[in-house]
Amino acid sequence: VRRCGIIAFAVLVICASTASAENLLAGADIGYGEYLSGECVTCHSQTGVDKGIPSINGLDAEVFASVMHAYKTGDMEHPVMQMVAGRLDDEQIASLAVYFSKLPGSN
């Protein structure tokens, strides 16, 4: 249910955003995303399955990037995620988005 809410929010952000999906994923490097993923998988487990913490494995790259940008700008509220996203630049977000989108989802 929570994953659906996140996806719905991200779709609205993508539709309302002046930045295209291409811009959200500009500079993406899957290898760099894998390198950066260590902090993410501390909470979002490698298997992508955890009670209470949404799975990010297999999440559409555009959705992932939109959600991370929403946390970064404060449009979505969650203290930990705002802190994490706030430390990432656009290339890092894009690289993480592409990396996690290529992992098998938990659904």
Regions found by a protein language model. Name each.
Residues 33, 38-46, 96:
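The canonical Cys-X-X-Cys-His
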Residues 30, 34, 48-77, 82-86:
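Gly/Gly-Pro-rich "capping" loops immediately C-terminal to redox-active cysteine motifs
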Residues 17-37, 104-105:
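Electrostatic cytochrome c docking/interface patches
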Residues 2-4:
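Positively charged n-region of N-terminal signal peptides that target proteins for export
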